[in-house]
């Protein structure tokens, strides 16, 4: 499967690593160009000290990485979920599965992250949630 993980924090990076190690073609998106280049150059995320990133992982700061993806994992901070979802809505292929892994509710609307993603993408894609304790 072709998978884009949006958000290169500790959670997004850990999920990207696991997905890549399980044989998927994974691209890890970072909001900042410099951060993306640093991950690629060092093979490490400073948020996960001592953990080597898999050689097969791809890095980008371009949201076009979602085009043609079978799955898009939304691992951005909650304050950036709506904006990111709105920006990718027109780039998604029919049938793309959106996975919400961001915690929290939106200030003002009190919507869950999965509800924001569904609303921002026009309710045209399946949205699932992965959460923990």
Name what the model sees in each region.
Residues 1-51, 58-61, 87:
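NAD(P)+-binding Rossmann beta1-loop-alpha1 motif at the extreme N-terminus of oxidoreductases
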Residues 53, 64-67, 71-133:
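Rossmann-like NAD(P)(H) cofactor-binding subdomain of soluble oxidoreductases
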